[in-house]
Amino acid sequence: MNLNRWLFSTNHKDIGTLYLIFGAWAGMIGTALSLLIRTELNQPGNLLGSDQTYNVIVTAHAFVMIFFMVMPVMIGGFGNWLVPLMIGAPDMAFPRLNNMSFWLLPPSLLLMLASSAIEAGAGTGWTVYPPLASNLAHAGASVDLAIFSLHLAGASSILGAINFITTVINMKTPNMSFLDMPLFVWSVLITAILLLLSLPVLAAGITMLLTDRNLNTTFFDPSGGGDPILYQHLFWFFGHPEVYILILPGFGIISHIVAYYSTKKEPFGYIGMVWAMTSIGFLGFIVWAHHMFTVGMNVNTRAYFTSATMIIAIPTGVKVFNWLATIHGGLIKWEAPMLWAFGFIFLFTVGGLTGIVLANSSLDIVLHDTYYVVAHFHYVLSMGAVFAIMAGFTHWFTLFTGYPLHSTWTKIHFTTMFIGVNLTFFPQHFLGLAGMPRRYSDYPDAYTLWNSISSMGSMISLTAVVMMTFIIWEAMSSKRSTTTTEQMSTNVEWTYLCPPPNHTHVEATHLIRP
C-alpha cells in the first residue's frame, strides 16, 4: 500500500475512505467515553472519584462524537464519496483543499484528547460556558487546548463546506439542473451552507473566550463590562444550526435508501423534500435562544422562540410523511439498510416529539438541564444521525469496497443496536421528568432503577459496536462477489462498477433523463 497515495491524496474516493476510517476510530473512542459515563451512573456512589473527571469525560464524549465521528463520516465520508459520483463530476472542485480538510482533523482530535489528559482536563460541558471556562474556574491549559482543537475542526469544516458548495454549483454534468440533483446532494449542499454561516460565529465566541482567559480581556466578565450571556448567544447561534448540520445529510441518506428498498425510482415528493430541507436550514438559524429559556428572557422573546421552534416541526413532518409515502405501495426489500431506515424514521420522530415538548418555554424551565433533554437529543443523534450512518454504510459498503456485507449478521447487528440504544435512552425520559439533573456523577437512591437499566442498555450497544467490527472483517475476508444493482437509472452512483475506478470519468458526462 503506497503511503503517498493516502498522505497526499487528491482523490475524492480515497479522501472519503480516510474520513470513514477516521470516523470509525473516533466513534470507538466516543463509545468508550460513553461507557465510562454509564458505568459511573450504573449505581449511586462514586466510581471515577471526582466530578471534575466525570465532566471531562462527558465533554470529551460530546466533542469526539460530534466533531470527529458524525461530521467526518456524514459530510467527509459519504459526501466525498457520493457527491461527485451523483452529479457526474470527475472529482471535487478543490482536490488539494479536500486533502487538507481531512488532515486538519487528526491533529484536532489529538488536541482534544490532550486537553483531557493535562491538568484537571476541560470539564466545562461541550458548551464551554464562562465563567466555568474562565481562567479562574479552569486554570491551566486544558480549555485553551480544547479551543484550539475546535478552531482546527472548524477550519476543516469551513474549507470542506466551500469545496462542496463550489463542487455542487459548478461541477454538475452540463444539462443537470438543481432540481435534477439527488436528494443526498441537496442535503450536503444545504449542510455546507449552514456550516459556512454558523462556524465563524463559534470561532468568534471561543476566540473571545481565549483572550478572556489569557490576555485579560473581559468580553464575558461582568467586572470589566462584559456579559457571559453574550457567549451563550454566540455559542448557540452556532450550536443550533450545528444540530441540523448533524442530521441533514442523514435525511438525504434515508431518502435514497427508502426509495431504493421500496423498489421506487425516486422518493415521493422530491421538490417538497428539497424545500423542507431548505426551510429547516433557514429556520435553524432563528431559534437558537430556545437553549437559553432559563437565563431570564422576557415573555415576548420566549413566545417568539417557542413558536419559531415549533414551526420547524412542519418541514420535518413533511419529510417523515414523504418517506412513509415513498414506502407505501412499494415492494419492500427487508434488507439491513431498510431496517436502519425504518428505525430512523420511528425513533427520529420520537426524538422530534420530545423536542416539541421542550420547545415550550414554560415546560423547559422545569426540564432544562435534566435527563429529559439528554434523552431528547440522543434520540435524534444516537438514533437519528447514527442510524442514518449505519443505513448508509450498509447500503453503500458494496460500492466503496466491492464486497457485500453478510445479510444475516447485519440484521442481527441492527436488532442488537436497536434494543441497546432504546434501553439506554428511553428510561432517561423518566429520570428527567423525575428531576434528575445532567452533568452530575452521583444521584439520590430514588433514581437507581432507571439508571441501572440505562447502563445495561449501553452494554448491549457496546456488543453491537464490536459486532460491527466483526461484520466488516467478515465481508473483507470472505470477498463475496457483487450482484447487479437495481434502479440504475435513478441511482447514478452505481453505474460505474463496484468499487468504481480511481478516476471516474475520462471524458465529459451528459445527463439522460429516464
Swiss-Prot record:
Residues reported in the UniProt entry to bind heme a3: H376
Binding site for Na(+): E40, G45, S441
Protein residues bound to O2: Y244
Chief site of localization: mitochondrion
Binding site for Cu cation: H240, H290, H291
Keywords: Calcium, Copper, Electron transport, Heme, Iron, Magnesium, Membrane, Metal-binding, Mitochondrion, Mitochondrion inner membrane, Respiratory chain, Sodium, Translocase, Transmembrane, Transmembrane helix, Transport
First-tier enzyme category under EC: translocase
Chain residue numbers at which the record places covalent cross-link 1'-histidyl-3'-tyrosine (His-Tyr): H240-Y244
Biological process per Gene Ontology, one example term: mitochondrial electron transport, cytochrome c to oxygen
Binding residues annotated for Fe(II)-heme a, in chain numbering: H61, H378
Pfam families per record: COX1
GO function term, MF aspect, one: cytochrome-c oxidase activity
CDD domains named among the record's database cross-references: Cyt_c_Oxidase_I (cd01663)
Binding site for Mg(2+): H368, D369
Quaternary structure and interacting proteins, as annotated: Component of the cytochrome c oxidase (complex IV, CIV), a multisubunit enzyme composed of 14 subunits. The complex is composed of a catalytic core of 3 subunits MT-CO1, MT-CO2 and MT-CO3, encoded in the mitochondrial DNA, and 11 supernumerary subunits COX4I, COX5A, COX5B, COX6A, COX6B, COX6C, COX7A, COX7B, COX7C, COX8 and NDUFA4, which are encoded in the nuclear genome.
Protein name: Cytochrome c oxidase subunit 1
Organism field: Pelomedusa subrufa (African side-necked turtle)
Gene that specifies this protein: MT-CO1
